From Swiss-Prot:
HAMAP family (alphabetical): RapZ_like (MF_00636)
One annotated GO molecular function: ATP binding
Positions annotated to bind GTP: D59, A60, R61, N62
Protein name (Swiss-Prot/TrEMBL): Nucleotide-binding protein ABO_0549
UniProt similarity note: Belongs to the RapZ-like family.
Keywords of this entry: ATP-binding, GTP-binding, Nucleotide-binding
Binding site for ATP: G8, R9, S10, G11, S12, G13, K14, T15
Species whose genome carries this gene: Alcanivorax borkumensis (strain ATCC 700651 / DSM 11573 / NCIMB 13689 / SK2)
Any matching Pfam family: RapZ-like_N
NCBIfam families: PRK05416.1
Amino acid sequence: MKLTIISGRSGSGKTTALQALEDQGFYCVDNLPVGMLPTLAKQLSEGDPPIERVAVGIDARNLPAQLLAFDNILHALNEQQVRSEIIYLDADDHTLLTRFSATRRRHPLGTDQRSLADAIGHERELLANIRQRADLVIDSSNHDVHTLRNLMRERVARREATLSLQLESFGFKNGLPTDADLVFDVRVLPNPHWHADLRPFTGKDDCIIEFLSQHQASHDMLKDIGDFVVRWLPAFANSDRSYVTVAIGCTGGRHRSVFITEQLAKNLRAEGIVLQVRHREL
C-alpha cells in the first residue's frame, strides 16, 4: 500500500489537494485522528480487494499529544510495511490571513481570546514536527485552485516509484521559493530588462532566447547547472528522497531564469529525465 499523508496549515489548500488525489483514484479520508492511521492502513490493505493508494488528511485539529506521537505512528506504519509519504502544504502568513478574511471562515484554532493571526501562528507550532518530516513541502501562496490541483496530479498522483524533479524559475525580488532544495542564481547573466524592446517578453520568447544565446556566459551557466543536476540527482534518489525542486532565480523572474529553466528542462528531458517545470512569476 502507498499511503500519502496530506498535512499543513488551514487555508493552505489541503482540501483541494485531497480532492485532486481522489479524482486520480486515491481512497481519501480527511481529518483522521493521527492515532488511527495504523488501524486504517491495516483494514484497507487487508480488504477484498485491498486498496493500494490511500490519501489521508491530518491537521491541527488532532489532539496535541497525538501530534507529538507522530514519529511513533510512522514507525508503526513502517512495521506494517506500508509505504508512506508526507505532503505538507503551507503559505505565508499574509496569504493565509487574506484567504480567511475573504471567505470569512473561522480558523479551526481561533477562539474569542485568540486572534486569527495568533491562531495561524499557533498552528505552525503544532504542526512543526510533521513539516520537518515532510517529503514534499508545497508553498501554495502563488497557486490558485487549478494550478494546485495540476501540481498534485503531476507531482504526486501520477508519479512512479522514482524521484520527482521540478525545475522552478523565480525572481529574487519576490523572495526565495520555500520549497526549493537547490537554488541557482543566474543574475550574473546579461539582463534583457535593460533593453526596452525586449522588456515586455519572457524567457520563453524567441527574441529573449536569441539575445541570451548570443552570450557565452549563458551557455556556460546552462552547462554547469545541467552537469550538477545530472551528477547529483542519482545521489538524491539513493538517499530515499522522493521529491527534489531545483529553483533558478534572476531579479524579476521573467527573463534569464525562465530561459535557463526552459533550456535546462529541454536538455534533461533529452537525457531521459522526467520532470515538471514551473515559472513562479509568469
